[in-house]
UniProtKB/Swiss-Prot annotation:
This is Protein TIC 214. Pfam families: Ycf1 (PF05758). The gene is TIC214. GO terms for cellular component: chloroplast inner membrane. It comes from Dioscorea elephantipes. Coiled coil: none annotated.
């Protein structure tokens, strides 16, 4: 088994080694590169598909493989890589090849035309074709990685190359892997090509296949061309790209030193030194700057010329050295006269320009390597002129020592590596033996251990001295910083900003006060001041290192130009030459004066020696202006050492900046692409020079036309904004734009997420589906309750959507016209043509035709009315966006920018004119329709590019008139018909009367005929009619009528005529009677059946219902039988003992009332009480706690019988809990009730009666409803307390029992009797804790006892949460939730969070905990149970002097905090003697280090906003003086005697608190006089006072108008906005639109003479807003804000926070200022302020713990200086004793090896007794990963710690110091 496992292990290790070997990895990466198929494969496929022969296929494959092999070799072979990687090299190779390829393709046509070639020439041509195929595949394989973009897979080999040691083997194996992949790809391609001819569908179309094969070459050429054009369109060619304007060198020299990055040297040379410097060359400068040899020779010639000059010659020599391959040139002052200075410079610059044109190499001309080729955005810094190159991260690989080992750094500084290589080459004795890796590491470990040991010993020794309690040595034991002094005697240091020995957050910004213009403007000052100012400023620039956050003003401007020389000469004219000559003989040797030489000695600089040295520098250029000669005394060089910052050599601007800078000059094409915009001129002021008669010259000089223009931006998507012109577009993949105007780019993968794609934009699929299914199912939609309201809402919504859709359509149409070439000119000409046709041809023709028609119809013509309306129509020319100009003035550049034509008062042709009265009514209806815009088709539109509106028809009034006339004709016709009908009725009446006397004659005639029938029937035979009746019978008798009919017919023929008539008559009568009887019987039978069925159905239904009801009742009775029997027995039990309980409760009540009277007489309780106030729950609690083995609860109800209590605040959980505490009934009485989780169904009245007997609520109460104790009740209670509104993740992170203690637990209101039995064991523990505090007078013991108590029982924390659930209704006396239920008169019991407390207890105003719930809060959650917070939402004080803040707060919180309100017990001392003011314990006296801008809205005026969110996060550090005192600096709020009183009470109050005590004590006497009184009246007074003081903003301003002027108000608001808030003022959006509409009308009115009609019509149409016109010109800023014209909105800014600020924030968020809450941690400052408080002065209130014998630092390492501290932490962090010689640090990856490592958020911290010290150790550990980040920042070339954000809190060991 062992052998097998050994073999198996060896086999596994062998497999791992094989997989990790270089060969296998190379094969894998090479195989992956096969999938990077690019355009180079097109030639390979072309040879295979076109089937041009085996030779071409072989040549194509060979060329393809050869090209790929060269690419792999170029990775390893540097010259080949450089040759293939340089763009100009590849371009030089490709261009001739493409030219040859073009002629080669055309040669075939030439040879086919001539037909003179022989067989040999054809063979040669075929051979050349094979070679051409080889070259195509070879070259395009090389070009794939450079001209055309390569994929990630092709770059994998390059990436892994840097990790591989055996590079050649890796390259070979990767090539073999690629070859294998290529072979498989070609085999697959051959199978596909073999399958294509075998397919039946392809074989059936042989003609198409042959055509496709013949055109295959053309198809491949087209595909290749499209691919190249596509990629070249993204990456423009360097030759074709736009050439940017480079800053000329003369321009750079004339501007600033910063733009050109020059190193300026001011020198006065000796001949010897010049000779030495001419022969010396700086190798580093020559290597870096690449000076031309001709330039060097030119410099030598200039220096030789300088040697020939005399010693008295005055010479300025300016040397400008340009970096980054910029040519080096020199400008010399060749003439001695200052007047020829500019002339000499111009000549030299001109020569230099002409020289540079011929000197510029061809490569730089074709390929500008300084320009942008990538899609970079030109991020310009306003503090610099030229943009800085973003070249911080230079990927340069070099080996460097790291953690004791040689490692490859990919961002090693190139200059440093070059310098090290130069040193190794220069120093031949560099023979130091290189240690092995292990030896090097061991040496590094040893040195680190030694450093750590020494520093730890030093730290321990300092700590031991501090523990000896010698105050005199405390200052000495603190390690101090090294500072640079100005004066040793006065101990004046340099400012932290200027001190080079300090770094980090102390390095501030330097503001330059003196520039060239300032110096020139100060010529009138004295000479000494001028000299001192000039040269001190110069030395100031040399000495101090400038930060990036200041605006550079280089010193070249100070020495460059004639004005500066004149200034120097004037300033030195009154100073004698001898004085400077004598002073110049000073023995200082400052030949090479620099910053490093000053700071190396680290000594103080004497001011006197500074002055002498400065004067000594001046005597080199002393000038006597009388004889105009110069004196050269000594050669002194002052060199500026500046860091070379790589900058772009281009100064690019966008369109707006170009217009601003070049208003008078001719504007050039800007270099940056800005948002597409057009400048639309809306007004031109040409009237300013109309009255003056001037010449042409004066006109050209003075007649500057003023133009008012608007900028019209394009509404289409702008993806190219701020991109430099000529740079390639962003290579975005998987993004498509299918719309013409698309705001955002979308990926094709997310088309289903978009509402409407471009395929289905015309209709909605869901709507169609709903319609189909609705019709299919034939179901009508159900009626809704608020159907009408929803319909109106839907209509409004649809109207808005339609309006927005129309707006989008109009924008799309306008942008379409604006993007198409020459579209604006075509559209403009069409509009002008339509305007002319409408105005002068169509409308006059219609007027003429109408009036002629009226004349032909014999009506009066309306020439005057029509012509008047026609003349009234105005065709106003507008800009493209609708700004009106005039009828005759066209917009500027309207052919390119576009034009609109607006028709005012459009003419409408009418067949006739109405009277004036009726026309006025119609005008009012159509006042908004008296303008329109002309379309290109001559139609009228409401808006530009809108849909044409429906025009009124000419014939419509005619049709209406004809309809009216037809109606009249119809009316007349109907009248005639009515008359005819009436007459017809009369005629019929007469006819009826006539028929009345004819009827008797007829009857008589019938009677006579009957008589004749009796006498002679044969006589009337011919007159009779024979009728055969067939009776209607059922189907059974269907055959019978037929038989009867036949028989009857036979009988009729043969029988006697006399007997027939009688028989027939009898049969007819019989049949009629039979049918009638039968029908009646059937009808009666049907009716009877219906009645019987209805009755039976109703009976069945009633029976079923009764059965179901009985069944349900029976089931319910069975289910509830147990509880019913219990309740029945309990009801009998209660009724029996009801009287007994009532009598017993009355007796006990009387006993306790008498006892209470006796207690009130004593001095134990001195409570302020209200006679009409009953603390309901507290009385219950006290009476219950004072009753031993009692069976009832006693209520202490006052004598007022009109009190009603709202039981909505009492939950059923609380009632059940109280009931369960009764010993008699707990086991039996309400056991079933307590088991039921809801309101008990059958015992509601019983429970109410029981509660009344127990005194839980009054018998007269109207509110007897008891809430349910469901889980939802608990959730609702949590929702009411909005500090519990947390996310699920935060809830899981919380420890619920700790957080419940944190938020809800307060101090106890102690009971009167020391022997009283408390409600539960938790309250006993709290009382013991307070008793322990009282005995020891040490408030620090609270935390220690709390921590010990936490370890007693683990289930205690969970019981606490359940206990709170059971007792959350008891909100007064419970230590968990101490809130009062106070009733005044008939006032209902209200839910109140605010508690009446003693002196040391203050208000808990809850805040949202989810804003400050971070990791720091959860660590010490239950340490301080009584954290005090203050709600800054109530900080809306009025602006006046004497503010009764305490009374104001009492009124707002609905309680009263009285000074005389005390809480004492028999054995317990009161907790605090000092009454702290509410603003003191909040901790707002700290100095605010920054202004909160997380949500920066105004917090001083209540109408703006209150700084609530920022206060919620850090309630203890908000400076209250920023809220109030700084705004009232002109008011004397406090008095000094009040400060003295408070200082006597509390000698430990800090100096910052005095201001607040002044604020408090202004009304202290008034508050003391209040004493005890009626709480209700006090509350009423306070509320009234609060109402009086809390005025609105406008009332406050009215009040201030009496005291201050208008300017003071504006200054105050400006002060408020600028200093304390980061805000900006902007226009309201609606006001902005109204202003634009007014401007459009103003542009037209300015061009009109008579504006009355246009103004009135514009106001009627709503185009002109009168409220905007009423805005005053000099309106105050406050009034503009008040009226809503200006809106204050925040500015989102970024704050850079220093190290101290981060410390202060970290501790300030997590800790509450305990010395201001309860006086626990009152500090005593025994440390000297000059030394210690200078460093930690603002944080010392958080450092002390109140113990006189011990001073608690954050961590003991604070004894050391920050630099030493950081070094110690880094050495400890290395943990070198546990390391092995491995490649990784186990401290960062193996948590088990870390000592004292714990989880970051641990529920139970094993800490010392003093949690405060533990917490600070947690916050400031012994080492931090941030320190490593700071140490290694240069290894990574990054300026921030963003790379270490994930590992920032990886491990924080707590107590390891050494």
């Amino acid at each position: 088994m062992i052998f097998k496992s050994f073999l198996l292990g060896n086999l596994l290790s062998l497999c791992i080694k094989i997989i990790n070997s270089v060969v296998v990895v190379g094969l894998y990466y090479g195989f992956l590169t096969t999938f990077s198929i690019g355009p180079s494969y097109l030639f390979l496929l072309r040879a295979r598909v076109m089937e041009e022969g085996t030779e071409k296929e072989v040549s194509a494959t060979t060329g393809f493989i050869t090209g790929q092999l060269m690419m792999f070799i170029s990775i390893y072979y540097a010259p080949l890589h450089l040759a293939l990687g340089r763009p100009h090299t590849m371009t030089v190779l490709v261009l001739p090849y493409l030219l040859f390829h073009f002629f080669w393709k055309n040669q075939k046509n030439f040879t086919s035309i001539r037909n003179a070639s022989t067989r040999d020439s054809m063979c040669n041509l075929r051979n050349l074709n094979i070679q051409c195929v080889f070259l195509n595949n070879l070259i395009f394989q090389l070009l794939n990685h450079f001209i055309l973009p390569s994929s990630t897979l092709a770059r994998l080999v390059n990436i892994y190359m840097f990790r591989c040691n055996n590079k050649m083997l890796f390259v070979t194996s990767s090539f073999v892997g690629w070859l294998i992949g290529h072979f498989l790809f070609m085999k697959w391609l051959g199978l596909v090509l073999f399958w294509i001819p075998q397919n039946y569908s392809i074989r059936s179309n042989k003609y198409l296949v042959s055509e496709l094969r013949n055109s295959m070459g053309r198809i491949f050429s087209i595909l290749l061309f499209i691919t190249c054009v596509y990629y070249l369109g993204r990456m423009p060619s360097p030759i074709v790209t736009k050439k940017l304007k480079e800053i000329s060198e003369t321009e750079e020299g004339g501007e600033s030193e910063e733009e050109s990055n020059v190193e300026t040297t001011f020198e006065t040379r000796d001949p010897k030194q010049e000779q030495e410097e001419s022969t010396e060359e700086d190798p580093y400068l020559c290597w870096e700057e690449k000076e031309d040899p001709e330039k060097i020779d030119e410099r030598k010639e200039i220096q030789v010329n300088e040697k020939e000059k005399t010693k008295n010659e005055f010479d300025f020599h300016f040397k400008e050295t340009y970096y980054k391959d910029n040519p080096v040139h020199e400008d010399s002052y060749l003439d001695t006269y200052q007047d020829n200075w500019q002339l000499g410079r111009l000549k030299e610059d001109k020569k230099q320009k002409t020289y540079l044109i011929y000197k510029k190499p061809l490569v730089n001309f074709l390929f500008d390597y300084k320009r942008w080729n990538r899609p970079l955005r030109y991020i310009k810094n306003d503090r610099f002129e030229n943009v800085v190159r973003n070249e911080i991260s230079q990927y340069f690989f070099y080996t460097c020592p790291s953690d004791g080992k040689k490692r490859i750094s990919f961002t090693y500084p190139l200059s440093l590596s070059t310098l090290s290589e130069m040193i190794e080459r220069k120093i031949f004795l560099y023979t130091t033996e290189k240690l092995s890796h292990e030896g090097l590491y061991n040496y590094w470990v040893y040195t680190n251990e030694q450093k750590k040991y020494n520093m730890s010993n030093e730290l321990l020794s300092r700590i031991k001295v501090l523990e000896k309690e010698k105050k005199s040595l405390v200052i000495d034991m603190l390690e101090k910083r090294t500072r640079l002094y100005n004066d040793e005697n006065e101990q004046k240091c340099l400012h932290k900003t200027y001190d080079p020995l300090l770094n980090g957050p102390y390095r501030g910004t330097i503001k330059k006060l003196y520039s060239k213009n300032d110096l020139i403007s100060n010529r009138n000052r004295t000479t000494e001041d001028a000299i001192e100012t000039f040269w001190i400023n110069k030395i100031h620039d040399i000495l101090y290192i400038y930060n990036d956050s200041r605006k550079f003003e280089h010193q070249k401007n100070l020495l460059d130009g004639e004005s500066v020389l004149n200034f120097i000469g004037n300033s030195l004219s009154s100073i004698s030459i001898g004085k400077f000559y004598l002073e110049s003989t000073h023995s200082f040797n400052l030949k090479k004066f620099s910053l490093l030489s000053l700071l190396a000695e680290q000594k103080t600089i004497d001011l006197e020696s500074q002055a002498k040295s400065l004067k000594f520098r001046i005597d080199g250029i002393t000038t006597d202006l009388n004889d105009e000669t110069t004196i050269r005394n000594k050669s002194i060089g002052i060199e500026e050492i500046l860091k070379k910052v790589p900058r772009w050599s281009y100064k690019l601007t966008n369109g707006l900046e170009e217009e601003d800078e070049n208003e008078e000059e001719s504007t050039e094409d800007p270099g940056l692409r800005s948002r597409k915009a057009k400048r639309v001129v809306i007004y031109t002021d040409n009237d300013q020079n109309t009255n003056s008669i001037t010449t042409n010259n004066s006109i050209s000089n003075n007649d500057e036309v003023e133009e008012v223009a608007l900028i019209r931006y394009s509404q289409q998507s702008d993806f190219r904004r701020d991109i430099i012109k000529g740079s390639m577009r962003a290579q975005r993949r998987k993004t498509v734009t299918w719309e013409m105007f698309q705001a955002n780019m979308h990926s094709a993968l997310f088309l289903d997420r978009i509402d409407k794609t471009f395929f289905f934009s015309s209709f909605d699929i869901s709507e169609m589906r709903n319609i189909i299914f609705r019709n299919w199912l034939r179901r009508e939609p159900e009626l809704r309750i608020s159907e009408c309201e929803e319909e109106t809402k839907e209509k409004g919504k649809k109207y808005k959507e339609k309006k927005e859709e129309n707006k989008r359509i109009r924008i799309a149409i306008s942008e379409t016209w604006d993007t198409i070439i020459f579209a604006q000119a075509i559209r403009g000409s069409m509009l002008i043509t339509q305007s002319f046709l409408r105005k002068y041809i169509i409308l006059p023709s219609l007027i003429i035709a109408k009036n002629i028609g009226r004349i032909l119809l014999f009506q009066f013509p309306e020439w005057d009315e029509d012509l008047k309306e026609w003349n009234r129509e105005m065709h106003v020319k507008c800009t493209y966006n609708g700004v009106q100009l005039s009828e005759t003035e066209f917009p500027k550049d309207w052919l390119t920018d576009g034009i609109q034509i607006k028709i005012l008062f459009p003419f409408c042709l009418k067949p006739w004119r109405k009277p004036k009265v009726r026309s006025n009514l119609t005008k009012k209806k159509r006042k908004k329709e008296n303008f329109c815009f002309l379309t290109i088709w001559g139609m009228e539109a409401e808006l530009p590019f809108g849909s044409p509106r429906k025009q009124s028809s000419f014939f419509e009034p005619i049709y209406k008139e004809l309809e009216k006339k037809m109606r009249k004709v119809k009316k007349k016709f109907f009248r005639v018909l009515r008359v005819f009908k009436e007459r017809k009725k009369g005629f019929l009446k007469v006819r009826k009367e006539k028929t009345g006397w004819i009827l008797p004659i007829v009857l008589i005639r019938k009677q006579i005929m009957k008589e004749f029938e009796k006498i002679n029937p044969i006589f009337l035979f011919k007159l009779s009619k024979v009728k055969v009746y067939e009776p209607h019978e059922k189907k059974k008798n269907d055959k019978t009528p037929n038989k009867i009919t036949r028989e009857s017919s036979i009988q009729i023929r043969s029988m006697n005529w006399t007997n027939y008539s009688l028989i027939e008559k009898k049969m007819k009568d019989l049949a009629d009677r039979t049918l009638t009887t039968r029908n009646q019987i059937e009808q009666i039978t049907k009716d009877n059946k219906k009645i019987a069925i209805i009755c039976d159905g109703k009976r069945l239904e009633s029976r079923k219902k009764i059965f179901q009801i009985l069944k349900r009742q029976y089931i319910r009775l069975l289910r509830k039988s147990d509880s019913f029997m219990k309740s029945f027995i309990e009801k009998i039990y209660i009724n029996i003992f009801l009287c007994t309980i009532n009598i017993f409760s009355i007796n006990i009540q009387l006993f306790f009332e008498s006892k209470k009277k006796n207690l009130n007489k004593s001095t134990i309780y001195n409570d302020e009480t209200n006679q009409n106030t009953m603390n309901f729950i507290s009385t219950l609690k006290k009476s219950f706690s004072n009753t031993i083995n009692s069976t009832t609860l006693i209520t202490n109800i006052s004598n007022n019988s009109n009190i009603y209590y709202n039981l909505s605040s009492l939950s059923q959980a609380y009632v059940f809990y109280i009931l369960s505490q009764t010993q008699l009934f707990n086991k039996y009485h309400l056991r079933s009730v307590l088991h039921y989780d809801r309101t008990y169904p059958f015992l509601r009245d019983t429970i109410k009666n029981y509660c009344m007997t127990q005194g839980i609520f009054d018998t007269k109460s109207r509110y007897k409803k008891i809430h349910k104790s469901e889980i939802n009740e608990w959730k609702n209670w949590l929702r009411d307390h909005y500090q519990y509104k947390l996310s699920q993740t935060k809830w899981f992170r919380l420890v619920p029992q700790k957080w419940g203690n944190k938020v809800n637990k307060h101090y106890i209101i102690q009971n009167k009797d020391k022997d009283s039995i408390k409600l539960d064991s938790y309250k006993k523990e709290k009382d013991q804790l307070i008793h322990y505090m009282k005995q020891n007078h040490n408030y620090d013991a609270v935390d220690s006892l709390t921590s010990q108590k936490e370890k007693l029982k683990k289930h205690y924390r969970y019981d606490l949460l359940s206990h709170e659930y059971m007792n959350y209704g008891n909100r007064e006396d419970s230590y968990i939730y101490e809130s009062t239920l106070q009733v005044n008169g008939n006032q209902e019991i209200s839910y109140n969070l605010y508690t009446m407390k003693a002196e040391s207890y203050y208000i808990l105003i809850t805040i949202v905990i989810n804003d400050y719930l971070e990791e720091g809060y959860i660590v010490d959650m239950d340490q301080n149970m009584n954290r005090k917070y203050f709600d800054s939402r109530i900080l809306c004080f009025p602006i006046r002097k004497n503010i009764d803040i305490e009374a104001w707060i009492n009124a707002h919180i609905d309680t009263k905090i009285n000074k005389n309100l005390k809480t004492e017990t028999n054995n317990y001392q009161k907790l605090a003697k000092k009454k702290l003011f509410v603003f003191d314990w909040i901790g707002m006296n700290e100095e605010r280090l920054y202004h909160k801008i997380s949500n920066p809205e105004p917090w001083f005026f209540p109408e703006f906003w209150l700084l609530f969110n920022a206060y919620k996060i850090k309630p203890q550090i908000i400076p209250i003086q920023l809220l109030f005192l700084n705004f009232y600096f002109y008011e004397n709020i406090s008095q000094s005697n009040n400060i003295n009183l408070d200082q006597k009470k509390n000698p430990h109050i800090s100096s910052n608190q005095k201001e607040y005590l002044e604020f408090e004590n202004s009304n202290q006497e008034k508050n003391e006089q209040q004493g005890q009184g009626d709480l209700r009246s006090d509350l009423r007074k306070q509320k009234k006072k609060d109402v009086e003081e809390n005025h609105t903003k406008s009332e406050i301003k009215k009040h201030k108008k009496k005291k201050q002027s208008k300017s003071n108000k504006e200054a105050e608001l400006y002060f408020f906005l600028k200093k304390y808030l980061l805000f900006q003022l902007r226009w309201d959006d609606s006001l902005n639109q109204r202003m634009i509409d007014n401007i459009k009308v103003y542009c037209l009115l300015l061009r009109l003479i008579n504006t009355k009609e246009i103004v009135i019509s514009s106001i009627q149409r709503g185009e002109m807003c009168l409220d905007v016109m009423l805005i005053q010109k000099d309106l105050a800023l406050t009034e503009l804000i008040k009226k809503g014209i200006l809106i204050i909105e925040p500015i989102r800014l970024f704050l850079e926070r220093g190290v101290k600020l981060i410390i202060y924030q970290t501790i300030g968020i997590s800790l509450i200022n305990k010395n201001q809450t309860n006086g626990k941690y009152l500090k005593k400052r025994y440390v000297d302020k000059k030394s210690f408080d200078r460093y930690i002065g603002r944080y010392n209130n958080m450092l002390a713990n109140g113990d006189k014998n011990h001073y608690d630092f954050f961590v003991p390492e604070n004894i050391l200086s920050p630099r030493r501290r950081r070094e110690l932490r880094i050495l400890i962090c290395f943990n070198s004793c546990n390391w092995n010689v491995v490649d990784r640090n186990p401290a960062f990856c193996n948590e088990n090896k870390i000592k004292n490592y714990r989880q970051f958020l641990n529920k139970h911290l094993n800490t010392d007794t003093n949690k405060f010290t533990k917490f600070k150790l947690f916050l400031w550990p012994n080492y931090r990963l941030e320190d490593l980040a700071c140490m290694n920042r240069y290894w990574f070339d990054t300026n921030n710690g963003s790379r270490f954000s994930m590992s920032r809190i990886h491990m924080y060991p707590r107590f390891r110091i050494i």
